[in-house]
Amino acid sequence: MPHADIRTSTITPLVRATPWLIALYFIAHVALDAVSYVQPVLKLGITPLSPQTGLVLAFLYAYRGNFWWVAAAFLVSEVVIRGIPMHSWILPLQAISITAVYQFAAWLLRKKVPMEGVATLSGTLKFIAVASVTAIIAGTVSVGLYTLSNLIPADQFSSALARFWVGDLNGILLLAPLLIRFADTPLLLRAILSRPAAFIGVLLGLFAAFTLVFLVGNPGDLRFFYLFFVPAISAALIWGVPGFLIAALALQISLVAGVQRLAEVAPLVDLQFLMSTLLVTGLALGAVV
């Protein structure tokens, strides 16, 4: 296996986060929420991209005793980024409920699908399943609260839930594995640098795809975005799951930048459903090659 040297087999024991780490988590949570606040629904925070969910799951997975810190981060982020809604009672209830969902997901992953160690297809599929269910439950709670308080019309429940779900799902699939295995970053960098030609090829592939989609082709046509699959999947075949996620992270940043800078581009929510397909495919491929 060409990327076996970037996989570890040690499951990290739970420890308490230091005050500095908690402060860093707060800053990162709010920052990720802010940069991904793109194309929201009625300024209620329902965006098609929520990278902070991956941070939340990784933090709860790696450190114990942080439920209330995470709930507070959700609450602070909502107030800072979106302001206080008409019914202010929603905010603490939403923050506590969503944190409980992610706390259970983190516990379930540690018990049944430990994220450290050699990536397997079975473990990867279980992780994807946990991420999908976590996102749909969190989405149902949030959108349900907004609907019950008449902040969202009942006939928009399903569309708002779909937007919430895909945003949370992609955040989990993309960032949680990278952050949980952050200690493996030096090994990954050495593996990448040991194959400079492959690294340059993937980098040029991402640049070429971005150029063809946003500058040459029609960014309003979703079919053009399949060009991004080629370099991302190539990274999965070369470096496994960690390499694929690095490429996917670069791709996600490119998509957000393109959507924000161009007027005529496919809706970000449609691009995120496409991104979900890529993430599931790349994670599965990276686990078996």
State the predicted function of each range.
Residues 2-48, 52-152, 176-189, 193-222, ...:
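Short helix-perturbing small/polar motifs within transmembrane alpha-helices
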Residues 157-170:
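Short aromatic-rich membrane-water interface segments that cap or initiate transmembrane helices
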